[in-house]
Structures are given as C-alpha cells and as structure tokens.
Amino acid sequence: MKIEVCIDNIESVHIAQNAGADRLELCACLSVGGVTPSYSLIKSAVDFANIPCYVMIRPRAGDFLFSTQEVNMMLDDIHLAKQLGAQGIVIGALTKHADIDLSVCETLIQAAEGLGVTFHRAFDLCRDPVTSLEQLIQLGCERVLTSGQKASAVEGQPLIKQLVSQASNRIRIMAGAGINAQNAALLVKNTGITELHLSGKGYRLSEMPYHANAVMGENSEDDQKIWRTDFATIRAVKTSVEKY
C-alpha cells in the first residue's frame, strides 16, 4: 500500500516524509486543489526528500480546459521539473465536452519522457469514466487519482471498485478526497485500491507575538495560522492500512 501526500510548503515535506509518506505531490495553493509550485519549492523538496516527488502541472485554478498559451506554460513547467530532478508530474486536461484532451495530454506526456505521470482529479469531471480510463492507459499514464466522481472517495467507492477491476493492473487507481484513519482501511478493503492520496491538513499557530489588524486571508484568524501536513494524521492512515 502506497501513501501519497500532497503538500504546498517545505515544512510539510519534512513532516510527511517523517510520518511515513511513500511519495509527495508538490503543489501550491492546496485550497484550490493545487496548482504548479514554485521553482524553489520543487528544488528544496527534491534536494531534501528521499521519497519520490511528483510535481503538479496546473497553471491556474478552475476548470481543465486550457488555452494554447497555458499548454505552453505547462510544457515549460515540465521541463523545469525534469531539470530539478523530480521523479514525476501530475497532469490533467479536458475538452469543452468533458472528455480527456488526448492531444494536449499526449504533448505533455511526451515532454515528460522519463518521468512518471499521474492523471489528477480532472478525471472526476469526465463525462465517461470508463472510456476515459482506457484512454489514459493508451496514453501511458501510470496512475489516475480519483474520488470515484463523488465529493469524497468514500461516497465514490462503487466507481472506484469498478475502475480497479477495469484497470486490471494496466494502470494504478489511487483514491483521494476525504481520506483519513477512520475510513482508509475500509476503503482499501471494499475497492481493492493499492494507493491512497491525502493532504492530512493541519496547522500551527504563528510564533509572532505581535498581530496587526490587517487581514491577509479570508478572515483575521487565517493570518495567524500556518497550514501544514499533520504528522499524526499521516501516521494514523499509514498504520491503519499496514496490513494491506
């Protein structure tokens, strides 16, 4: 059983690895589902971590219908990820009709030659998951992250189980969205998945004794919180699925 932890700061890299993560997904802005991280975060994570680092390739929040300029930006980010020594990338592109954008994905995958490729939860917005999975297999993706096209992986268990059966070891199905120590083992048992994805989000309070009245986040409380991976959450999930 593999545990992938998505992170958006260097503190979380240390915490996730020490808690037992098997792989890191490097992002910025997890609050919007993750976008491409900075040069410095990729470099620092790759230099420090002794587990694989996969870089999110997503130029903005929102949908997964990308312009030509955005595709070119993603190509630049893939080249950077390779240059910095990342082990893989995380991509997803759809057509306006909610099908896999085969042309864009093929272009991105070709640019990533030599790296592992995960197709992210854009899959959960596809109108035909069965056909889409076959297309991702043909494209050469090594795994797809999915919640079973529901708000959480627990709700999406029926489709996840179906996808595991359909994949038949041709591609890995990684479940994500709402994973915790209370549901991880049952999800694995019910669906047959071999990989789990989570952020294990927690926070620590700012160490600054002086707090201005200015608001940088959505509310003043956010200004005093540093969001990061929670060690206990990752360790608990890891422990709960060890027998698998």
Swiss-Prot record:
Pfam families: CutC (PF03932)
Location in the cell: Cytoplasm
InterPro entries per the UniProt record, alphabetical: CutC-like, CutC-like_dom_sf
Primary residence: cytoplasm
Gene3D superfamilies per the UniProt record, alphabetical: Copper homeostasis (CutC) domain
Entry GO MF terms: copper ion binding
Gene Ontology, cellular component aspect: cytoplasm
Alphabetical keyword list: Cytoplasm
The family this protein is said to belong to: Belongs to the CutC family.
PANTHER family according to UniProt: COPPER HOMEOSTASIS PROTEIN CUTC, COPPER HOMEOSTASIS PROTEIN CUTC HOMOLOG
Protein name in UniProt: PF03932 family protein CutC
Organism this protein belongs to: Pasteurella multocida (strain Pm70)
Gene name linked to the record: cutC
